[in-house]
Amino acid sequence: MSTPRTAPMSGTSRRARSAPPLGPRRGAVPASEATATEPPDIIRALGDEHRYQARLLNLLERQVGLLNQRQVPDYDAMYGVMRYMTQFPDRLHHPKEDLVFEKIVQRDAGAEPKVKELLQAHVDIIEKGQHLLEAIEHGRKGDAQADPNVLRKAAHAYIGSLRRHMDIEHLHMFPLAQKVLTAADWVEVDARMKPIL
């Protein structure tokens, strides 16, 4: 009497069955070194906030595109975006970055000119955001001060400034922070951020 053949497990191939046991991948970072290369939680959180803000800027830009085509944008959506942008990033996000930048200058005096530029950019972005929010409110209400050209220019100025600013932070300042700040610096920055939240 012959024994019944067992069918191979579905989805497996000869190569999969003969693969070596799982172990560290070639080029994988050992666990002991992984923490040294991973961004600190603060940088990760700031990056997540930037990604969310970038999505909102895309939404805003689509509405401005309608204005460029002489169509009526969704003023309520634009207002919602800018209400958020002038409440959360301006009041909570930028002050957290300022704490990181302050520590960078303490560790690397050569970064001071760039940090001053970024701190001034925070002030400028806040002003541009308020100007844009006002222009959107006029459009929403349809009042005599509503001017699509003013709104379009204000939106382009705000979107362009904020995108450039976030790019500088991602490409230069966040990597520099990871390079020069110590573990104790990150703990201090984190503790000082708590009241902001």
Predicted regions and their residues:
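Small-residue-biased structural context
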Residues: S2-L197
